[in-house]
């Protein structure tokens, strides 16, 4: 699919106020973000976290604050569990969403520990038989097209442009970007990992490199 020029906000009848923006780095904002997730935004979390359309508001959005220590995993977990206990059996659908959220907090710790135990995953493949599977060098134009969201694949490009503009993207779409780069473009995961690490507001090495290798 041939790429067109990126339209301006005026062309799309959008005001600058409607453009996505980065999250504000404050502890008070971290706590309020978690609370709005627990009290309202997260009601359909387990059903809406996979879509790039609904995930923007239905996901917790506290990952940047966890990465920079403005709120801890323990604190987020305790607040979430306290709120879940208050629900009781009154809302099974919402309780399921909170359980899904709590499990992801545990995964957060699991992957960080994995890097502590095996720091080589940042630079070497988890399974040595896959080393040198893809060339370490690539056509720079191909890599640039992927990095800038100009591959010609609408879904891929939309997600990459959104990430580049906001610094955030939901997990399923992150996985899609990596798998597309690895299998369709046959790019080495170390090349793509660097760009994504620079874009993610919530970059956390332990999670990042484990997921990059799993998806590639």
Model-inferred region functions:
Residues 63, 141-144, 154-164, 174-184, ...:
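Contiguous, well-ordered alpha-helical segments that form the cores/surfaces of helical PPI scaffolds
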Residues 191:
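Active-site capping/gating regions of soluble enzymes
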Residues 130, 134-137, 147, 195-216:
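C-terminal, helix-dominated tail/subdomain
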Residues 74, 113, 121-123, 183-188, ...:
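Flexible loop/turn segments at secondary-structure boundaries
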Residues 81, 85, 110, 116, ...:
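Hydrophobic alpha-helix feature that most strongly marks membrane-spanning transmembrane helices
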Residues 54, 58, 64-68, 72, ...:
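Secondary-structure capping and boundary motifs in well-ordered enzyme cores
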Residues 103, 111-165, 169, 176:
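A contiguous catalytic/ligand-binding core that recognizes phosphate-bearing ligands
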Residues 1-131:
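Glycine/tryptophan-enriched, flexible segments
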């Amino acid at each position: 699919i041939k790429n067109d020029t990126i339209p301006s906000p005026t062309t799309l009848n959008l005001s600058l106020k409607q453009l996505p923006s980065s999250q504000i780095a404050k502890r008070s904002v971290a706590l309020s973000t978690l609370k709005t997730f627990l009290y309202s935004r997260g009601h359909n979390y387990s059903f809406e976290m996979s879509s790039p359309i609904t995930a923007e508001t239905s996901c917790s959005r506290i990952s940047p604050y966890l990465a920079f220590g403005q709120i801890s995993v323990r604190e987020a977990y305790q607040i979430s569990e306290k709120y879940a206990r208050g629900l009781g059996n009154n809302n099974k659908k919402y309780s399921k969403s909170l359980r899904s959220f709590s499990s992801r907090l545990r995964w957060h710790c699991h992957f960080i520990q994995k890097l502590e135990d095996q720091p080589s995953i940042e630079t070497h493949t988890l399974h040595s038989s896959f080393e040198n599977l893809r060339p370490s060098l690539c056509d720079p134009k191909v890599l640039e097209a992927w990095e800038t969201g100009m591959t010609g694949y609408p879904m891929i490009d939309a997600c990459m442009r959104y990430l580049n503009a906001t610094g955030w993207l939901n997990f399923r779409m992150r996985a899609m970007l990596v798998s597309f780069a690895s299998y369709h473009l046959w790019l080495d995961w170390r090349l793509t990992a660097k760009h994504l690490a620079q874009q993610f507001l919530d970059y956390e090495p332990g999670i990042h490199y484990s997921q990059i290798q799993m998806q590639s």
